[in-house]
Every structure is written in structure tokens, then in C-alpha cells.
Swiss-Prot record:
Keywords per UniProt: Acyltransferase, Endoplasmic reticulum, Lipid biosynthesis, Lipid metabolism, Membrane, Phospholipid biosynthesis, Phospholipid metabolism, Signal, Transferase, Transmembrane, Transmembrane helix
Gene from which the chain derives: Agpat1
Protein name: 1-acyl-sn-glycerol-3-phosphate acyltransferase alpha
Position of the signal peptide: 1-28
Domain comment as written in the entry: The HXXXXD motif is essential for acyltransferase activity and may constitute the binding site for the phosphate moiety of the glycerol-3-phosphate.
Source organism superkingdom: Eukaryota
TM region(s), chain numbering: 35-55, 125-145
One annotated GO biological process: CDP-diacylglycerol biosynthetic process
Species name: Mus musculus (Mouse)
Ranges per topology, Lumenal: 29-34, 146-189
Length: 285
């Protein structure tokens, strides 16, 4: 049975009306629409990036192209990203960046502050994420199979050599997975072993909580939003050995968690979602 021509128009208008009603009446629907568009937009930008990046082949300099394409994404959602402490980045030497990991929105803060010749270490599954995976591979992103410990250790040893010989910086999320509970998970020690093995400094970066505008658990994504990205002073690993790694990881996590609580309660990213006795003040760096 064929529909008369006007029926398709009527169905389209009905669908648009339904979507509009869901958008204005359901915060959960708005959350899913926004996240679907966010992920779809990233895949589309990756398609644009692939032919440009392919000219160089797999090259860390291609991260500049991805960053340029992704920097505007915060404006689509009315998210203001404020960066503090960027002067703490060493101007020339290699280093390991460690950052907290809350959601895929971390990409917005990362692109805002990403240093030159810095690539993330990502789970291997991302490599198969369509156009995004290919764009990431062309940008030199390092993929690790977290299920195969032996392979991961081998890759990290190679990365340590790359840091020193090719003047590359790496960005690691030491929690190992996204954390939505308004705190920080215990840190895995791979990034710290890497920094100690290469004898390069660690640069902790903290992104404030998104709870005032985003919550996966509550299916909430509102606009506008504000996020502060705080770059902490370098942590030296000079002279440290693998035996020092557990204490090093705990110390860095403690300093990052302290800053996370401060900047998530000062009205620049977390509203009052994280209460801290005595109030919040400017972090002393």
C-alpha cells in the first residue's frame, strides 16, 4: 500500500512535533539528543580530518588538526572552559600528563589546554570507532589493550623511549575509566612507571566537576555550563625508581583530589555538588 504524497509530509511534521515536545518536556530526552549529536559531530569532524591528516601519515603533528576542529565544540553547548596554571607546562622537555576522567566531555577541556606534540594514551577499542578511530591513529594516539597486561607493559616501554627520542608528551587518564561519582577512582600506576622509567616530570591536570550542567546518572545535560581546567606544577621523577611509584601515585592523586574539590565548589564547574568543610578557596600552587 502506497502512501499519498502528502502523507510523508504529515508524518515528518508529526515526527518533528514529537521530537520538539520531548525536547522541551523531557530532560532525559534532551540528554540523549545532545549526547547523540555530540558523538555524531565528533565522527563527522573525524571524517573531515582524515584526508588532511593522511597527507602526513601517522604523525603526532596531526593532533593540531584534530584540536583545531574540536575547539569550537564547547560553543555548541554553551560550555565555558576556563584554564588556569598553563604556565606550568615545561616549554621544551617531554613529560607525562595525568588527568581525571569524568566523561566523553573531557575532550572539550583537553583540547582547550592540549600542549604541542602531546598525544593521549587510549584503550584499543577506540581504534575501531569508525572515522574517529582512524583519525586518532593518524594523529599518533597510542592504543593499549588493557586486557593484555604483557602487551601494555611492552607498549609503555616503547613509549618511554619515544618520549626521549622524539620529544613527545603523553596524556594519561590514570583512573583507567570514566568516573561519574564526583570524586576520583584509585589511580593505576602505568603512567607513573612510564614517567619514572623515562625520568621525565609529571604534569597533573584537574578538570572541575560537571555536575551543575551534566550528569549521566540523572540523564541531565543543560546549558550553559562552566568548567575549570587547572594545570598543577610539575612533579619531578628525577632519581626515583620503580619502588617509589606507589607513593608517587598516591601523592599525585591526593594533590589532584584536593584541587578537584576546591574548583568544583567555587562556582566554576561544580556549583554546590561537592561540599567541603570550611568552604572553598583559591588553590595555592
Amino acid at each position: 500500500m502506497e502512501l499519498w504524497p502528502g502523507a510523508w509530509t504529515a508524518l515528518l511534521l508529526l515526527l518533528l512535533l514529537l521530537l520538539s515536545t520531548l525536547w522541551f518536556c523531557s530532560s532525559s530526552a534532551k540528554y540523549f539528543f545532545k549526547m547523540a549529536f555530540y558523538n555524531g559531530w565528533i565522527l563527522f569532524l573525524a571524517i573531515l580530518a582524515i584526508p588532511v591528516c593522511a597527507v602526513r601519515g601517522r604523525n603526532v603533528e596531526n593532533m593540531k588538526i584534530l584540536r583545531l576542529l574540536l575547539l569550537h565544540a564547547k560553543y555548541l553547548y554553551g560550555i565555558r572552559v576556563e584554564v588556569r596554571g598553563a604556565h606550568h607546562f615545561p616549554p621544551t622537555q617531554p613529560y607525562v600528563v595525568v588527568s581525571n576522567h569524568q566523561s566523553s566531555l573531557d575532550l572539550l577541556g583537553m583540547m582547550e589546554v592540549l600542549p604541542d606534540r602531546c598525544v593521549p594514551i587510549a584503550k584499543r577499542e577506540l581504534l575501531w570507532a569508525g572515522s574517529a578511530g582512524l583519525a586518532c591513529w593518524l594523529a599518533g594516539i597510542i592504543f593499549i589493550d588493557r586486557k593484555r597486561t604483557g602487551d601494555a607493559i611492552s607498549v609503555m616501554s616503547e613509549v618511554a623511549q619515544t618520549l626521549l627520542t622524539q620529544d613527545v608528551r603523553v596524556w594519561v587518564f590514570p583512573e583507567g575509566t570514566r568516573n561519574h561519582n564526583g570524586s576520583m577512582l584509585p589511580f593505576k600506576r602505568g603512567a607513573f612507571h612510564l614517567a619514572v622509567q623515562a625520568q621525565v616530570p609529571i604534569i597533573p591536570i584537574v578538570m572541575s566537576s560537571y555536575q551543575d550542567f551534566y550528569s549521566k546518572k540523572e540523564r541531565r545535560f543543560t546549558s550553559p555550563g562552566r568548567c575549570q581546567v587547572r594545570v598543577l606544577p610539575p612533579v619531578s621523577t628525577e632519581g626515583l625508581t620503580p619502588d617509589d611509584v606507589p607513593a608517587l601515585a598516591d601523592s599525585v592523586r591526593h594533590s589532584m583530589l584536593t584541587i578537584f574539590r576546591e574548583i568544583s565548589t567555587d562556582g566554576l564547574g561544580g556549583g554546590d555538588c561537592l561540599k567541603k568543610p570550611g568552604g572553598a578557596g583559591e588553590a595555592r600552587l
